[in-house]
Amino acid sequence: MGTSTAKEAHALIASLRSAYSATPTKLKIIDLYVVYAILTAVVQVVYMAIVGSFPFNAFLSGVLSCTGTAVLAVCLRMQVNKENREFKDLPPERAFADFVLCNLVLHLVIMNFLG
């Protein structure tokens, strides 16, 4: 029972890897940025758990900035992906401009929250 499950898991990972290898480089860069933003948020949470959260608004601002940026990057990835039929009429330049504008608004709110 356990070996068939392990084989299925290995086959699943192999199929995911082969499908992801066909992904365009632009999307892989966005994926890398999303992973970086999430890992930065995780590092901040671990640091808060170990050291403490004395300036809690600073901790909250950092985590919300990281997760908000990751969410906006996922939205950018959805809009730039050529296989996504929902945004096929949207030019990539417009999607990137939306991403930059939303990031600007997000970080203005974060800076306002910091005080």
From Swiss-Prot:
Keywords: Apoptosis, Endoplasmic reticulum, Membrane, Transmembrane, Transmembrane helix. The keyword DNA damage does not apply. Residues 1-31, 77-94 are cytoplasmic. It is a multi-pass membrane protein. Residues 53-55 are lumenal. GO terms for cellular component: oligosaccharyltransferase complex. Signal peptide: none annotated. One of its GO terms (biological process) is protein N-linked glycosylation. The chain crosses the membrane at residues 32-52, 56-76, 95-115. It comes from the Eukaryota. It is found in: Endoplasmic reticulum membrane. InterPro entries: DAD/Ost2. Pathway: Protein modification; protein glycosylation. Subunit of the oligosaccharyl transferase (OST) complex that catalyzes the initial transfer of a defined glycan (Glc(3)Man(9)GlcNAc(2) in eukaryotes) from the lipid carrier dolichol-pyrophosphate to an asparagine residue within an Asn-X-Ser/Thr consensus motif in nascent polypeptide chains, the first step in protein N-glycosylation. N-glycosylation occurs cotranslationally and the complex associates with the Sec61 complex at the channel-forming translocon complex that mediates protein translocation across the endoplasmic reticulum (ER). All subunits are required for a maximal enzyme activity. Component of the oligosaccharyltransferase (OST) complex. Belongs to the DAD/OST2 family. This is Dolichyl-diphosphooligosaccharide--protein glycosyltransferase subunit DAD1. The lineage of its organism: Eukaryota, Viridiplantae, Streptophyta, Embryophyta, Tracheophyta. The gene is DAD1.
